[in-house]
Amino acid sequence: MDALLKEIEKLSQPSLQKENNDVCDLCFMQMKKISNYQLLCEECGQLKDWFEPEYNEKFTVYSRLKIVGANSSYHQRDLDKANSSDYSSLQFHHILEELKSLNVKYMDAGQKPFPIQVLKETAHSYNQVQQHRVIRSITKLQILASILRSICLKLNIACTVADAARFTQLNTKGISRGMDLLRSLFVDNKITLNVDLNPIDSFINSTYNALQIKQIHQELQEENVYNLKEIVKSFILYADEKNIGVDLNRRTVVIATMYNVLRRAYYPIEIDTVVYQCKIRKNTITRALKMYEDYYSHFKSLYEQYHLNAAKKLI
């Protein structure tokens, strides 16, 4: 009897070849495994999420059921999710490794890599989403991009929609489908990640750090640093309230406002320095600065309130 049980347990272990029996939902052709997470139909180009749980010695014939046949891996994931307490942990590590790989490619493309904390929180939040929604390949990258951006904003790390799309290698810069899904889950209290955080604080922090103000002026007190950031934020919020510059890119507005406030606070900084340090085009920031010239009468009271140079034009 013991020998028979051992033979049955061997048969229940995943095949070393990990053969894929999935067929395409659209054209019913055999699908090809192209990564550890996706299948591709070479006939019509359809992509499908694929997951094969790693074999764990503690899984026995009594604790793990194995589905065989067409579309087995598709249904196996749902079965493992229902029966295995390790599924969530396995999925977390799979997604984290995928994010790390994307981070390396992002860095190789000349971009600043995201901190490991961001990647871990993104993987954790993605796990939360999977518990409530079935995610198909067509939206998976958009969801990852949406989560990544929201995590960055929560941690006050600058990340635009374009940055998140570039990180996940989306063909377009739009991640609205992912944002809409996360927003609906947040409203229903199924996830705790808020996707509608204001990106201003993260852009202010990144601009301040890029300009290396603290390093250049070591005598600058933390209180003054806080005041500088709050002043910049108050100008932007005031402009939003008056519908001034709302059609401009938010990061551009933050950089232009930081430069404007620093100049009016008699801080020795040149526009070329801002262009170089913040990696922004000169004509782009110039257009945003024109906002403060065209609507000078609106901002004059703020200049006076914060004891800044209130002249209409700076020399």
Swiss-Prot record:
Superkingdom of origin: Viruses
Role of this protein: Putative initation factor.
Family: Belongs to the asfivirus C315R family.
Protein name: Initiation factor TFIIB homolog
